[in-house]
A protein has these predicted regions:
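Short, conserved catalytic or adaptor-binding loops enriched in Gly and charged residues
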Residues: 1, 49-52, 133-136
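Short, basic, glycine/proline-bearing loop/turn elements
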Residues: 2-8, 115-118
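Short, structured patches in soluble enzyme cores that scaffold and shape functional sites
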Residues: 108, 144-146
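A short, acidic, flexible beta-alpha connecting loop/helix-capping segment that sits on the rim
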Residues: 147-151
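Conserved small/polar residues in nucleotide/adenosyl-binding loops
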Residues: 153-155
């Protein structure tokens, strides 16, 4: 989808850095959060949507609905869309389903479970690292950058 101006992995999904730094940086007017669990949680979805400042629309979709929406090219004509998910596994699946993503920004991924630190504020488990390698094999430019004012770390 040509309208995706930022595809980002961030396990906090939406927070102040996204709204105050990334949205203005890429001039986004729409955010699509792709998360099956959050999409089913009506309360959490509502809270996330209500965080949107004027002029920004936030959607919370499970992966099936996100795939449908992102494939509907006319549905976001003229929009500048940020797509956010908690894991690179989600983006690997979106690409398998035919969604075109050229670049993937890996932002905050905290240490938990089997995750090990791989960069500042970024930790991955073996499956997530494998997904990153698969994305790179599919010619997706994957990089670490927590905020736009910091330099990119290319993978």
């Amino acid at each position: 989808m040509k309208n995706i101006v930022l595809a980002r992995v961030d396990d906090r999904l939406i927070h102040t850095e996204i709204l105050t730094l990334w949205v203005p940086e890429v001039r986004a007017n729409r955010i699509i959060i792709v998360d099956d669990v959050v999409a089913k949680d009506k309360f959490r979805s509502k809270v996330i949507k209500e965080m949107a400042p004027q002029g920004l629309i936030i959607h919370v979709y499970g992966i099936d609905r996100a795939t449908e929406k992102l494939k509907e090219a006319p549905s976001f004509d003229g929009e500048r869309v940020i797509v956010i998910a908690e894991s690179p596994l989600v983006f690997e699946e979106l690409i398998k389903r035919g969604i075109k993503i050229n670049q993937l920004n890996i932002g905050g991924m905290g240490i938990r479970g089997e995750r090990k630190a791989v960069a500042r504020r970024v930790a991955c488990d073996a499956m997530e690292m494998e997904a990153i390698h698969e994305l790179i094999k599919k010619h997706v430019h994957v990089y670490f950058q927590t905020v736009p004012t910091l330099s990119l770390i290319h993978i």
